[in-house]
């Protein structure tokens, strides 16, 4: 089990690392060459800046029981197919029960934008988001440990 983070624009990295340190879990953070990222705990892997290069690297790297932190529903869907866990930086857990709906809603929003309609921007990050991320990362770590035994 590892925690793999799409770290290009991921708030809450410190909370992810805190949970990982407390549970002795390896963390790998991926970013492209346009982002500078440093960590005393996590392994930082830098990839080319090509279209979806970080996403593709994460999808290919994901293994069963890994925990993937991503905002991208497409990445979440792909890693769920590899029997990994997926969670957003706001702490929402993606699973087989909600990923199809999320992908469909993303499709509808993109279609509306192409048609000239305005869609809503994401809300600002809150302390509740931080707490949800930390608690749900711990929850997924425990689930992954149970599945490994």
Swiss-Prot record:
InterPro entries: UPF0178. It comes from the Bacteria. Transmembrane segments: none annotated. Belongs to the UPF0178 family. NCBIfam families: PRK00124.1 (NF001095). This is UPF0178 protein NT01CX_0440.
């Amino acid at each position: 089990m590892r925690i793999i983070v799409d770290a290009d624009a991921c708030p809450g990295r410190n909370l992810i690392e805190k949970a990982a340190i407390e549970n002795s879990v390896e963390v790998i953070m991926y970013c492209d060459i346009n982002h500078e990222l440093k960590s005393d705990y996590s392994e930082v892997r830098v990839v080319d800046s090509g279209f979806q290069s970080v996403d593709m690297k994460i999808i290919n790297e994901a293994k069963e029981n890994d925990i993937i932190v991503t905002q991208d529903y497409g990445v979440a869907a792909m890693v769920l197919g590899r029997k990994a866990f997926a969670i957003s930086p706001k702490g929402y857990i993606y699973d087989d029960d909600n990923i199809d709906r999320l992908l469909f809603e993303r499709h509808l929003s993109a279609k509306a934008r192409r048609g000239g309609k305005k869609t809503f921007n994401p809300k600002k990050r809150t302390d509740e988001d931080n707490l949800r991320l930390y608690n749900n990362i711990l929850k997924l770590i425990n689930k992954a440990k149970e599945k490994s035994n």
